[in-house]
Structures are given as structure tokens and as C-alpha cells.
């Protein structure tokens, strides 16, 4: 008989799994473990009939509650009786409640009208409406729910939004202000230097190429041969400036790369002539493509003996759909050698040419707007933010806001370590003067005064805190009420993450999220910058988490506490090692896969009937072996007649675990005796294989 999963039945009934499970236990005394449990088709039909009957009964009861005339009683007596029996009808629309927010959820509505959220859920369920704790409500739904409790909702939202909306959406207003300036003063816009990002596969020569342009040597000093954080540099070529953003090379740093592309005007996609188009090449191309950024391809390592430029171009066409100009396409392709410097000048010329074609413009003066591409805390200088100025002039002494942080520019430092008085558009500078570490990817806006900046930043922070608190509270309710059974089934890995910069945090978070799996919940309970501290260990202990540090130290007190508490602390300098360890940990948590393995074959030579035991097959093992806890497929004239388990395996009179070819044995099959001499046997066993998890396994 066929079976159906709980969640499928719930979906058909317009319920959620938790509600159906409660109904089964209460009404039918059927206990199921989870939403993935199965029930017989017969039971499904019974459930559907019961719920439909219950819903129908509720409708009839509602109809019967209509006021009716009663004979032999005075009108006054009738009214008194009706009032006592049908009080909700008599008091309908007697109470009004004012709502002042669009952000209305079921728990908030329940509080506003003076009821328990669970009572509303039960009442509405009996009316055929399924609600969930903390569920978001639109105006119509909220009004319908309230009407069931004789409540009218008065929505006074427009006025509130007019008065408070501006304060709540500070960043949107600042962004709109700049967009309006662009629209109104197009004739005043001026050219600015292009911001270029070099992208590509790991070890294809990005850092070496950038170093050749800047005449520096960074790559040899870096651990693991890859860039460890985002940097921005500016060079001058033929009297024109070009700003470069150097992004990490490993594919795990997709978030860093995406952030780099967002502030980028031009992407240089680097491909090694001796390696061709690789996975990270495709990934980098997709980021540039989604950002709608023009792409210049630099085919690097042309100095190597095994360089194959033509094959690389073929792969550009087949894997990226980029057709080089010399092949009749429109993709500018430059042959370079980051090692010898060949082709570098041509690459810079092409960058300036594309920049001219793109007509990259900015507001050349006035208050500045800049993009934060990196942030960190320096022991001596405090919170720092690396920015690229997009518009206006950023000056020492300027007051600014950046998300929920604010400050006054105390110092500007360029990529050469020089202090500047001001920074013009496309200039990368490090800004000192933040009150706290700013979020990477946020926008810095210069404001009239520090007081105004502080006020605006505090309002942004309040809004962020409200957002973080709201969903968190509802999440706890959902877990407590609806998802407990899922948590009992799923395994969970809690991680506390520490790194040296926010850029690394974002990139590592992105890499870890790629390992999400239906069987395992991965939760980063905390992510911060700086050394691993005692407070981190305390949090990890309370949350049963592992502590992962990337390019950070750990306090000696923290390490002692971790040892005492039994908390695992691992620190890494190379991203590959960290990701590999997480992958191994998750693979160890996955249930192994059961696979079938053929062990041998044989033929039935004789049949024996033993009183009180049953029919036994006398078997000749031809190849391999047969084992007692294995299975057997029985074939007759080439066709499969049975697939059975082995009940007993004997060699002469002895019960044995296995028999190898070319020995003979006696086999009793489990619940099967319809065999005969000449039947062919195929022996197999089930083995458990450890599962592997790849970066590509993304389920959400």
C-alpha cells in the first residue's frame, strides 16, 4: 500500500506540518516523528474527512448563531437570552484599535487587540485559515482577523510615515540627493580616472601583474601565493591616472570580488596562456558581467614555453562567449607577461581607451561621496576605512557619516603611505577618524557638521538594531513552536569566526554558506575582527561552537580557558586550509551512503528438505564469495525470480559467516523456497560509503 509524507498531506489541506502532527496526536492518537514521516493512504483519507467535517461543523455552528424569535416569551426576555448566548454578535464593532505601522505581524496584532497569539491561531485554524506565529500581515488580513473579535482597526500610517520616514531612511535620502544632483547638473560633470579591478583564476598572475605596473613586489611576501585582503592603488600613465583594486584570487573570496566589481569601472580578466580558462575565471567573468562592467582580457604568461595563446582564445569563445577583436569580436584582448613586462603599456593604453569610450564622469568638487572597500582596527590609529572617492573632494576636517558610523577626517593616507590634505575622485585613501569600524561596502557621505553626522548615524543604528531584534525574536518563537521536531532530526555546526578585517569576514562567511546542506544547519553565531578573546571562548562554550581564526592571534588567557572548557580553537594563515577543515568536519557529520557491492556468483546444485527447518539450497560458489549477512538475486533462464536475504549459511554442518569459491555450501533463503536446481545466484552485500561535500553543493 502506498504511503504519503506528512508535509505533502499538510500542503494539500492548507495546513503546516506542525499543526497536522498535533491534530494526528490529539484526534487519532497517531504519533509521528517529523514532517518527513509517512502515513498510509487509508489514514490520509480519514484525516481529510475528519478535518473537512470539523470545518463544516464550525460553519454550521456559525449559521445557527443567528438571532431567532422565541414563542411564549416577552420580547424583553428574548433580548436578554440573545445577549447572553450571542454576546459577540451584539457587541460587534464596539471596539476600535489604532495601528500606526506597516510592519504588522500576528504577535503584534494580538498584543494590540489584547489576545494571545496562540488563541488567534487556533480560532482562525478552525475557520479554515492557517496562520503562523509572528506571520507578517497585510492590512486586509489584519482587518479580517480583528473583525472576528469585534475589533475595528484604524490605520494611521500615512501621516506617521510622512513625519518619520525621512529619519528612518537616512541612507536612501542621501543616495537620492546625489542622484538628483547628477540629473540636474549633467553639464557640470567632469571626467574622472577609471577604477580597474584585475580578476581571474588563482595563480594566473594578478598580483604579479599589478606589481609590475606599480614596480613593487608584494606577491612573494604573501602566504599561500594569493592576495590576502583587498588593496587599492593608483598609478599614472601618459599623464593620466588609473586606480587599481586588487581582489583575492581564490574562489572562496567571491564576496570580496563582487564588492570589488561594484566600485569598478573596468575589469581586466586575466587568463594564463599555459592554463587557459579555469573555474575562477568563469566566476570572475560572471561577476563582471552581472555588474555590467566592460571587460578587457589580458592573456598572461606568454613568455612561458608551453604558452598556447590560440587555445586560450578558443576557450574564451567556448567557455565565456567572449570573442577577441582579432577574431572578429568586440572583446579587447591584450597579450602580456607580468614577469617580463611585455604588453603592459598596451594594456594601460586599452584601459584608457575604454575609459574614454565609457565617458566615466563625476561631480568634481563640493562635498565628497566615497565607497568603503576595506575596514579594520589599527592598534595605534584606531578604526580605519579604505575608501575610493567617487564624487566631490574629501578633505581633512570633513565631517561624515557612513552607515551607522560617523566621524571627522583626521588624516588621509594614500597607497604610498603619504599623508594628503585632500582626495579627489577615484583616489584611494585610508581614512582615520571613524568612531567605530565601518561596514565594508557602505557609502561615506560628507555632512555639514559632526553633530548632524552623529545624529544621523545614531538613527541609522537604531533602525539596524530594530531590524535585527525583530526577526530574531520571531525566529525564536518559530523554533520553539514549529521547528523543534526539525531541529531534533538535523545536525548542527556552530562556528565562531574571527579575522583581521571585515573583508575577510564577509568572504569567509560566503565560503562557509556554500557548504549549506539539507542535513546540516551551519550557523555563524558570531563573526568579528581582532584576536580570539576570553569572551569569544565563553560564547563558544555556551553555544557549543568551534572557534576559527583567520590571520589573528589568540590571547593566552583565552587559550587556557578554551582548554579548560574543552573548546576547539583553530587558527589559519591560509584560506585553503580553513575551508578544507570545515569541509572535512561537515563530511564527518553527513550520514554515509549505502551502496550495493557484488561479491560473487554461484549455482544451485541440489535441493534438500529438512523437517522442522525447511528447504535448503545446495550451492556451488563459482566466483568470489557469499556472506551470511548479504543478499542474493536468483535467476532462472536469464530472468530474475527473487531478490532475498540469507537466513542461514552452512559449510557441512557448521554455520559460517562466509564461503569463498570454489567451495560448496548450504543456503536457506529468508521467506523464499520456490527455487530449483540450475538456478543461478548473484551474491551481494551493502556497504556504507563516506559522503563527500563540494563547494558547488549549495541548496538555498
From Swiss-Prot:
UniProt cross-references to Pfam families, sorted A to Z: EF-G_D2, GTP_EFTU, IF-2, IF2_N
Keywords noted in UniProt: Cytoplasm, GTP-binding, Initiation factor, Nucleotide-binding, Protein biosynthesis
Keyword GTP-binding: yes
Stretches the record annotates as G1: 200-207
Region (G5), start-end ranges: 337-339
Residue span of region G2: 225-229
SUPFAM superfamilies noted in UniProt: Initiation factor IF2/eIF5b, domain 3, P-loop containing nucleoside triphosphate hydrolases, Translation proteins
Record-annotated tr-type G domain positions: 191-365
Chain residues that bind GTP: 200-207, 246-250, 300-303
Localization terms from the record: Cytoplasm
Span list, region G4: 300-303
Keyword Nucleotide-binding included in the entry's annotation: yes
Ranges for region G3: 246-249
Protein origin, superkingdom: Bacteria
Residue segments, region Disordered: 58-85
GO MF annotation list: GTP binding; GTPase activity; translation initiation factor activity
GO cellular component: cytosol
Gene3D superfamilies: 1.10.10.2480, P-loop containing nucleotide triphosphate hydrolases, Translation factors, Translation initiation factor IF- 2, domain 3
Function, in words: One of the essential components for the initiation of protein synthesis. Protects formylmethionyl-tRNA from spontaneous hydrolysis and promotes its binding to the 30S ribosomal subunits. Also involved in the hydrolysis of GTP during the formation of the 70S ribosomal complex.
Family as reported in the entry's similarity comment: Belongs to the TRAFAC class translation factor GTPase superfamily. Classic translation factor GTPase family. IF-2 subfamily.
Protein name, per record: Translation initiation factor IF-2
Native organism: Petrotoga mobilis (strain DSM 10674 / SJ95)
Recorded name of the encoding gene: infB
